[in-house]
Amino acid sequence: MSANFLIQTVSNTPENILWHQSTVTRARREQLNGHKSYVLWFTGLSGAGKSRLAHTVEERLHRLGCRTFVLDGDNVRHGLCSDLDFSEVGRKENIRRIGEVAKLMMEVGLIVMTAFISPFRADREAVRNRMPYGDFLEIYCQVSLEACEARDVKGLYKKARAGQIKNYTGIDSAYEAPLKPELVVNTECLTLEESVSAVLRMLHERGMVVQ
């Protein structure tokens, strides 16, 4: 039995895994970037406008000279989470992975925006608890189910109503709205520009961006 094999097997246990601390800290990366890093977690039903809002906020922040990245719910299913289904277990693991990636990107010094339904409150709180206090900002894109169904360009709600899609959030799987999000954006009442302004205003008030 080779030494390499022994190392690979014992390293699977947590007590044999060491954390290697980089000499280049997050604070130094933030200083180089010229701004603080953090995570904006957009959550809401399918059709609530999460992706559109996240990408538009990113564009505005980019124009202000910020280093940014959007983790989009559909995009990660093409690679990082392509092995996961849409069962409750699969969704939990999907959010866990995204939370870890978002945390790593924040450590790099980026402003990270995530656009995921992330239907379960406990999963979102688990991600929040992995972040330093104040670095996870939950933005609830609030909209009625009726409005989401009216916006349903993919036809997914219609398929879920017909029983062709199982465990679809809002139809036969619950969405647990945030209890104390940092911001609620009613995308049913507000225009896209008004929604973007609400996000930027929150960041400005917290000293996280200069408008």
Swiss-Prot record:
One of its GO terms (molecular function) is ATP binding. The active site is at 118 (phosphoserine intermediate). Keywords: ATP-binding, Kinase, Nucleotide-binding, Phosphoprotein, Transferase. It catalyses: adenosine 5'-phosphosulfate + ATP = 3'-phosphoadenylyl sulfate + ADP + H(+). It is an enzyme of class 2 (transferase). CDD domains: APSK (cd02027). Its EC number is 2.7.1.25. ATP binds at residues 44-51. Belongs to the APS kinase family. This is Adenylyl-sulfate kinase. It comes from Thermosynechococcus vestitus (strain NIES-2133 / IAM M-273 / BP-1). The gene is cysC.
